[in-house]
């Protein structure tokens, strides 16, 4: 059995295979997932697993140098944004933050190596995580 925190084999595999600047999208239950992009569906029920708990587990294995978020998060879910930034800080990361419209965000998800769907049901609980390097 794995000794690290992240136990989902599919998600752990995707993290291990992506290179520098490649991306993984973490999303709420409602974000449309484009065909052709690998879907890792963790959603079990409304609110489970949460966006933040899943992000915390991902950050235990993935070095992130940049994040992309929809700018609308500030008007509709500022608390989640602040909690997300605290998680990056807890993992000793200070990624560059790129803000785009929600429409552009959805377009950018097409370039993700994988999209991880959570059971989160709060607005704009979505982030594109761009991989950094550990050296």
Swiss-Prot record:
Binding site for substrate: 28, 102, 124-126
EC annotation from Swiss-Prot or TrEMBL: 5.4.99.62
CC annotations in GO: cytoplasm
Disulfide pairings: none
Swiss-Prot/TrEMBL keywords: Carbohydrate metabolism, Cytoplasm, Isomerase
Residues at the catalytic site: 20 (proton donor)
InterPro entries recorded: D-ribose_pyranase, RbsD-like_sf, RbsD_FucU
SUPFAM superfamilies: RbsD-like (SSF102546)
Major localization class: cytoplasm
One Pfam family cited in the UniProt record for this chain: RbsD_FucU
Signal peptide: none
Catalysis performed (reactions): beta-D-ribopyranose = beta-D-ribofuranose
Cellular compartment(s): Cytoplasm
Domain of life: Bacteria
GO BP field: D-ribose catabolic process; fucose metabolic process; fucosylation
GO molecular function, one term: intramolecular lyase activity
HAMAP family linked: D_rib_pyranase
UniProt function note: Catalyzes the interconversion of beta-pyran and beta-furan forms of D-ribose.
Quaternary structure and interacting proteins, as annotated: Homodecamer.
Name listed for the protein in its UniProt record: D-ribose pyranase
């Amino acid at each position: 059995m794995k000794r690290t925190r992240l136990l989902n084999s599919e998600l752990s595999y995707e993290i291990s295979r992506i290179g520098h600047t490649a991306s993984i999208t973490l999303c709420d239950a409602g974000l449309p997932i484009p065909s052709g992009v690998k879907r890792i569906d963790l959603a079990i029920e409304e609110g489970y697993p949460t966006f933040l708990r899943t992000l915390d587990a991902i950050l235990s294995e993935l070095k992130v140098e940049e994040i992309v978020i929809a700018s609308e998060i500030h008007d509709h879910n500022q608390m989640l944004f602040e909690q997300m930034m605290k998680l990056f800080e807890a993992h000793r990361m200070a990624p560059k933050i790129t803000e785009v419209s929600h429409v552009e965000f959805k377009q950018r998800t097409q370039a993700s190596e994988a999209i991880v769907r959570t059971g989160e049901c709060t607005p704009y609980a979505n982030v594109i995580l761009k991989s950094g390097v550990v050296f």
